[in-house]
Amino acid sequence: MELIDKIQKNDEVMEEFHTSIHHGIYVSNAAYLLAKEIRLPEEQCYELAVAGMLHDIGKIRASKLLYIEQPDHHFVIRQLNYLRKHPFLGFDLLKDQGYSDFVLESILFHHENYDGSGFPSNLFGELIPIGARILRICDVFVTLITKKAYRPAYDVDTALEFMIGEVKNFDMKLFLAFMNLVEKLDVDRDIKKKTPVL
């Protein structure tokens, strides 16, 4: 209860909490739309929407580190190391809850980069499950177009330019499909809506 009280009394933390919820919804919407764009089976499109909603659920286990300030100067390093584990923590949290392997693998590997530089397993190329490759693109895009405490939201063109500069992280075919998709969408209406496609 002490943790919950501290969170509720901290306006900045509460704003971040709401931002996290919206982030999950936006990633869910984007992942579903990209899956439809590349003509994945409807069941996988739906499962990607589920995975998008839950992809950062492992951060819940990091909440004590995230939301309670500590005087320890090693705190930031510990926090970052713990956050790098959040894909596995999310997988572990959900593995016995009836989710499909497709959903679980998409969540577990959503921070893998196409060139092998990601985490938690340094997978590369098509060894990364397609759901995770889709989430990687959508997660980065949504992060860029969302306002943060330390910067304003980027417009769509700036976000895509940034992603082009980091294109080694993404499956090129999927990224080109995503760029084509974004050109056809109203991002505020189709991705940044507050209700998920589920």
Where are the predicted features?
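Metal-dependent catalytic cores of enzymes that make or break cyclic nucleotides
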Residues: 3-198
